[in-house]
Amino acid sequence: MAAPSHRRSLRKRRTLAVSAAVVAAGVGAGVFVMSANADGVDLYHQTLAAKDGWAASGTGTTGGAKADSAHTFTVSTRAQLVKALGSASDTTPRIIKVKGTIDANTDDSGRKLTCADYASGTGYSLSAYLKTYDPATYGRSKLPSGAQEKARAAAQAKQAKNIVFKVPANTTIVGVPGTDAGITGGMLQIQNVDNVIVRNLTFSATEDCFPQWDPTDGDDGNWNSNYDSVSLRGATHVWADHNTFTDAPHFDKANPTYFGREYQIHDGALDITKGSDLVTVERNRFTDHDKTMLIGSSDKDSTGKLRVSIHHNVWKGIVQRAPLARLGQIHIYNNVYDTTTVNGYAPQYSINSRAKAQVVAEANHWTVPSGGKVAKLLSGDGTGSVAGSGNLVNGTVTDLVAAYNAASSKKIRTTVNWTPTLTAGFQASAKNLPAELAGTTGAGVLK
């Protein structure tokens, strides 16, 4: 079996004691923060609440709240989204309202583009690529090079030019309620910018037409794809809230196998890398995905950064990286993890702490099906830490680190060098979280 690859202050919100969904579920104990219009602030001008995770640190996260009418856009096509985003270097505050689902794989006229369209004129063909780099003849000691690899890279670059949307600083991107708002087949790239809000969007089917074969990745090689649904690279003050991330409708079980390895067309769902910092990820729904959230792109990423809060999210049908954390100070609280296999996505682990990551995981709730092993909920390389208490497995308080360490030679440490203080909405008990979060997470909830 191959070894897994590891590459890769206007702030007011109404605090609701119980949402309508929770009341309907008969739950009355939990107090939690949920976005709503407050003091006349509409959905598009809402900003991150004080003390709501790391993104509230310092100047906080306000996105495009100060946008004027000339920089407030409603978009429903790829071309309109590109125009609304403008230049990645333009820091003028802007609000972008996404109405309906935008297909990133379309041209400026709205014509659907296929993988064949991107490959056209590059000289790339999958059959030629497979023949050229077959390990039986090419070997396994070096990366692909030569004409077909250059052609693959050229085709991939054509797709990237079309589906990667570069988000400038001081931007709010929000799905219009009631329109099934989202982006399919595309990637929001938030790179080297500050102060971005992404809310109420469904990100689906982010697919790379041209994965690269790497025979040196792991024991048996791997096919690696290039696009995350949302990618933070050197970004600061980012708030991702009430979004849904899914591979649907193309699940990994439909992927073919070449050279004995899955031809993986999906990469991350929401990756936080290249020294990104001060990020809050809350009330999102992650489902039907393999490598879901990477915090830190390598063991040598920037130290003193990668401070991330992850709370009140639902993770179901997730194989791994929920998240995989390196180096930073990461607070994971009040999340719901369901490790039931869904649509072929069989969980390997939930949280991986490696490269001296300082993780505090507390008051989260895991549902583990019959036969599942608590020892496999965590993972690590022997240098990372996971502190925290109040985590439940099937309703029972469980010491996740003790369970993992008892079964692994690479022990997870239990002490960290920091104490979370930005914890708005924290619930000491995880007991009622599955019922509470069932109807209050993901896209389509905000009004």
Predicted regions: what is each one?
Residues 79, 101-104, 178-179, 371:
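Acidic glycine-/aspartate-rich tracts in secreted/extracellular proteins
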Residues 324-447:
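Extracellular beta-rich repeat passengers
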Residues 39-45:
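Cleaved targeting-peptide boundary
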Residues 169-179, 194-207, 228, 234-251, ...:
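Right-handed parallel beta-helix
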Residues 52-97:
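Acidic Gly/Asp/Thr-rich repetitive segments characteristic of extracellular carbohydrate-active
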